[in-house]
Structures are given as structure tokens and as C-alpha cells.
Amino acid sequence: MQVTVEATGELERRLTITLPGSDFESKVQERLRSMVPRIKMDGFRPGKVPYKVVERRYGSAVRQEVSDEFVRDSFRDAIKQESLRPAGMPQIEPPQLEAGESFAYTVTFEVLPEIESVKLEGIKIKQPRAEVTDKDIEGVLKKLQEQHIEWEPMERPAQEADGVTITYHGSIEGKPFPGGSKENFFVILGKGTTLKEFEEHLIGVNKGQELTFEITFPEHYGNQELAGKKASFAVKVISVTAPRLPEINEDFAEKLGVKEGGVAALRQEIKASMTRNLEQAVRDRVREQIMDGLLVANPTTLPISLVKEETSILLEQAKNNLAKQGVNPQEISLDESPFVEQARRRVALRLIFSTILEKQEIKADQDKIKQRVTELAASYEDPEEFSRWIFSDRERLSEIENAVMETQIIDWVLDQVEVLDKSMSFEEVVNPQISSAKEKVQD
């Protein structure tokens, strides 16, 4: 086998692979002769069809079949011989199959960039230091109260923050319009869930009151068919209710699933959950900083084919997410450009991580894999069944192994770089938007 390698770009390679034509022809004849005993054809006894007849009938298909095998096997041997690492699918120009000539073909593909070593210079990690305080717990309790608000009927006029249940019928120029009528529609005044002008007409209404008013839809209203148009609404007020926060007591704790221990046990569960969230948020922040640092310290040319492949995956995920929300992806055209940068980031990190795994000889820690599965199983009704489900499927287990190896890579980098403690509050750690805004103010 003769192999010539041509660099047609920074990462693109063009291979010309030549094999003796006699080897190809011999393999074709061998394949055809092996078929003769099995061939049944009108006018001939089973297994007695002449070779020439078999060749005439099946020769073309067999030559293509053998050609595919020669290409597959020789390409594999060629990249091994030339120490090449293909990235993405190769583009193969069909070989010439003329009898008696050499079996030659060309294949074009990108190779993975050579990263001799992963640089860590300049990477500094700010590791958050925070704890769950009583104030944080009180904040969660407050949110839980708000999530379980009880609405108390009122005989007074509706005011800001009240809940008003109404039935309304809307029309434009005397004609009903799609979505313009609702029965028993509940709206919290001042919450902003409906048009502000619509809500303003409900301030001061009483139970049983009927009223008619007009509003003008905003010019940039979501439904363009209604944007800028004036609509008339006939409204009947079914009820006016005021929000009442439930007391934080044993009944409230039971309602949240705490059967024993009352409020004290509820606080303990909240703190334990918040602590887990805090620990995960710290890991996520450190992980993101390490990834950002690795990308800055190790710029590299990326294979276009891998970036395109990753972009397609992200685009497909976006379509699936839309489908879950009830949107038909076929009815909209998603632009792939917003996904390209994310795809480039993923491909670059995959190459860097792969180099670290290879150079540092990092293997998936089996104890950590078992620990990870146990942690995931803890949230299921039957943890043992979940664990068996994970370990019984190679693909599912592979996902766990990859996650564990990524953690091992992060831990290795963390041991090599400068780590600075940064005091933060619980909210700043778990809500990046808060800390980001605070940093901008300080800057």
C-alpha cells in the first residue's frame, strides 16, 4: 500500500492511497466464486451456474462491495501508518474500478490539532466562601409562604396586590377577536401578568360589579394582529380576594411534607437543601472559571467539521426544547449562528480535556463512579433499582464516567493553579446575576 499525504490547510489533509489492482481483482473473483454454490438461477441446476454467468449478473455489486471494504480497511491502516488523527467524517472520492489498474482513491479530512501540553499560566481561581445563615433560611421560608398564599374573600373595593376573578368579553370595532374572551380569569393587580391599562380599570371594583372600558394594545404587542388597535371590554367581577400569608407553624410544615419535628425540622431540611445547593453552586463557579482560564491560556485552531457537528447538535436540542413547550419546530426557522460560539467552546474544551486525560493518564475512578450513582439514586423512590438501571446500560454508565472524569480534570487543574478565597453571601453564590451586578458596581 502506498500512501501520500498532502496538507491542504492548517488542519486539512488529503491522502492518496494506492493498492495493487491485482489484490482487488483477486478478492472480487474469490467473492464471486464463493457465491456460485449458493446461486439459484432459471435454466441451471442449483449450484451449477457458470462462473461467467454469475460474474455478469453480480459482478458490479460485488466489485462495489469489495471496493467499500478495501477503502474502509486501507484508510484505517493509512491513518495509523501516518499517525494521523481524523476529526469528523472523511470525504472519499470514489476509487477507479477499471480492471487491471491500480486500486487508487483520495480522501480529504481534517485532523485534530496537536496540543503538546496544556498551559495553566495566568489561571487564578476565586473560590467562593459562603455559608447558609439564619437570614437565608428566613428568606426561603418567606418564599414558601408566598408560594402557598391563601386568598381571602373581600367585600371592599379591589386594591393593589388583590386577586380579582373576572369574566370578560373583548371586541374590536364591535367584533370579537381570538383570545379576547375568558371565563373566571384570575389576575393579581400590580403583578404585571396582564396589560397595565387593563389592570388599572380593575382597581376599585367590587364583587358583582359589571363595567365596560376601552384599552389600546401597545404598538409592540406580541400579537401583531392586535398591536396598536383599540379594543372594548365588557367585564363582570366574580370575586375580590386579598392575599394572606400562611402562618409558619406545624400545619405549614406538614403541608410541605415534614411529618415530624414541626418548624424546627422544616428549618433543618431547608438548611440541608440550601447547603447542597451552595456546594453545587461553588463547584459550578470554580468549574466555569477553570474552563474560561483553560480556553484563554490554550488558544487553538478548531476543526471546522467538529464545530459544524456540535452546532447541529445544539440546534437539534433547541428544537426539542421548543417541541416540549408545544411549539412545532417545523413552523419556525432557527438561525444556527447563535449556537456557533457555544459549539466552538465545547469543541475547544473537549480537545483540552482530552489532552489532560492523555498526558496525566487520568482514568475514571471507579469508587467515585459508584459514589456518583449512589448520590443520584438517593432522590429516587427505589435507589437500588435506579443503580441497577445505570450499571446495566453501557451508554448510561458512560455518561456518569465522563462526568466523573471531568470532575477529576477540574480537581487536577485546581491543584496546579493559584486559588484565592472570596467571601460571598449565599445569594451571591447561587445567583450569579446578583454577584455580577455587585462586581459591576464595585468596578
Swiss-Prot record:
One of its GO terms (cellular component) is cytoplasm. PROSITE patterns: FKBP_PPIASE. It catalyses: [protein]-peptidylproline (omega=180) = [protein]-peptidylproline (omega=0). Keywords: Cell cycle, Cell division, Chaperone, Cytoplasm, Isomerase, Rotamase. It holds the Pfam family Trigger_N. It is found in: Cytoplasm. Residues 161-246 form the PPIase FKBP-type domain. It comes from the Bacteria. Its main location: cytoplasm. InterPro entries: PPIase_dom_sf, PPIase_FKBP_dom, Trig_fac, Trigger_fac_C, Trigger_fac_C_sf, Trigger_fac_ribosome-bd_bac, Trigger_fac_ribosome-bd_sf, Trigger_fact/SurA_dom_sf. One of its GO terms (molecular function) is peptidyl-prolyl cis-trans isomerase activity. Its EC number is 5.2.1.8. GO terms for biological process: 'de novo' cotranslational protein folding; cell division; chaperone-mediated protein folding; protein transport; protein unfolding. Belongs to the FKBP-type PPIase family. Tig subfamily. Involved in protein export. Acts as a chaperone by maintaining the newly synthesized protein in an open conformation. Functions as a peptidyl-prolyl cis-trans isomerase. PANTHER family: TRIGGER FACTOR CHAPERONE AND PEPTIDYL-PROLYL CIS/TRANS ISOMERASE, TRIGGER FACTOR-LIKE PROTEIN TIG, CHLOROPLASTIC. Consists of 3 domains; the N-terminus binds the ribosome, the middle domain has PPIase activity, while the C-terminus has intrinsic chaperone activity on its own. This is Trigger factor. It comes from Nitrosococcus oceani (strain ATCC 19707 / BCRC 17464 / JCM 30415 / NCIMB 11848 / C-107).
